[in-house]
C-alpha cells in the first residue's frame, strides 16, 4: 500500500520543521518510493520552505545527475544518481543520513553519494509532499513511507 501521486496534487503540513533541524544539525531521512516513469526533477518531499542557497532539505526522485536525489540549493552539496532511470518501475529504498559533516545517501543498499557538506537550514513554515515549496517539480509515483529524524542514524543494510 502506498500514497499515489499523479503530479497534480501536493500535501502541505500545518506544522513547521522541528527546531532541532536547523543550521548544520544532523538528520536522517528514509523513504520507500516507486516511480513508473522518472522525469528529470520530481520532488517527493520538501522539508523546508526556504528558497536560499544551502537552506533546503528536499528529497527528489529525478534523473538530473547533479541534484536528482537530494537538493540543498547548493551545487556541490546536492546529490544525483546517474543510473536513476534504471530504477523506473522498481521500489527504491532511499536512505539519507547526515552527521553534521558527512551526508551519505543510499538507494537499495548501494552508497550513491558521500560528501563533506555544510548546510544553513533556517526555520521552515511548512513541509510539502508531491512538489517543492515553489509548487514545481511535481512527483508522479508512489510513496509507501517517509520518515525524518532529527538525529544521525547510520545506515544498516536491509535484511530480506
What are these regions (language model features)?
Residues 90-104:
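Localized edge beta-strand/strand-to-loop motifs within extracellular or lumenal beta-rich domains
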Residues 115-143:
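Flexible glycan-contacting loops in extracellular carbohydrate-active proteins
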Residues 68-93:
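Short, aromatic/His-centered strand-loop micro-motif at the edge of beta-sheets
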Residues 16-19, 80-86, 116-118:
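Beta-strand-rich interaction surfaces with strong enrichment in secreted/lumenal proteins
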Amino acid at each position: 500500500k502506498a500514497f499515489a501521486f499523479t503530479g497534480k496534487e501536493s500535501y502541505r503540513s500545518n506544522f513547521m520543521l522541528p527546531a532541532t533541524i536547523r543550521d548544520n544539525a544532523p538528520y536522517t531521512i528514509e523513504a520507500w518510493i516507486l516511480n513508473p516513469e522518472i522525469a528529470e526533477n520530481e520532488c517527493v518531499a520538501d522539508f523546508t520552505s526556504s528558497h536560499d542557497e544551502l537552506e533546503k532539505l528536499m528529497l527528489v526522485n529525478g534523473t538530473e545527475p547533479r541534484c536528482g536525489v537530494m537538493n540543498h540549493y547548493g551545487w556541490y552539496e546536492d546529490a544525483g544518481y546517474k543510473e536513476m532511470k534504471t530504477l523506473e518501475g522498481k521500489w527504491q529504498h532511499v536512505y539519507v543520513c547526515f552527521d553534521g559533516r558527512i551526508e551519505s545517501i543510499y538507494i537499495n543498499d548501494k552508497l550513491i553519494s558521500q560528501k563533506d557538506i555544510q548546510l544553513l537550514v533556517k526555520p521552515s513554515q511548512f513541509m510539502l509532499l508531491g512538489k517543492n515549496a515553489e509548487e514545481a517539480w511535481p512527483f508522479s509515483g508512489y510513496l509507501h513511507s517517509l520518515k525524518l529524524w532529527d538525529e544521525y542514524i547510520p545506515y544498516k543494510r536491509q535484511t530480506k
